[in-house]
Amino acid sequence: MRLYIKHTAAVIFFIFTMLTLHAQKASEYQVKADFLFNFSKFLEWPSIALGQPNEPFVVGILGNDPFGNYLDEITAGEKIMDRPMVVKRFNSIHDIDKCHILFINLPGESSEVLNTLKGKSVLTVSDEQDFNRNGGIIRFYSDNDTIRLQINLDAAKTANLNVSSKLLRIAKIYE
């Protein structure tokens, strides 16, 4: 038990340190890309959403890609749940066949996208102001030059995603 507490404290310390250092040295979207990469370690998807064991774990970007090549670079060669992690870019919600984490960058259109994805096990992420209110799961926001998270637990439950308590500790819960 003591080892578990030390491990949890170390993970939380690492995340806060990463946030602070990256906010100072990296661009805003590099920090957000790091989060997208790491979200997969703090959520559980139902096995049916993961598909066959040989299928990749897909991080998607819908709309304009603000990450450049950075997200591709940090995910190259990485595995999530023994699956290769791949980044895919989509111009339309209708182009998405399989996606596990989706960053939505379609200002003013996220509500329509979220309605289309409702009930599917996709972690939806955006930095749009009303994202959580519209049914999005994780919203990035800035607080004193630090990237923070706001999580809509009802939306996560609707998507059949289990959010780790470790992630919840560093996030603001949307109510």
Describe each PLM feature range.
Residues F13-L19:
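Sec-dependent N-terminal signal peptides of Gram-positive bacterial secreted proteins and lipoproteins
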Residues R2-A10, L21-E175:
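Short hydrophobic alpha-helices and adjacent helix-cap/hinge residues
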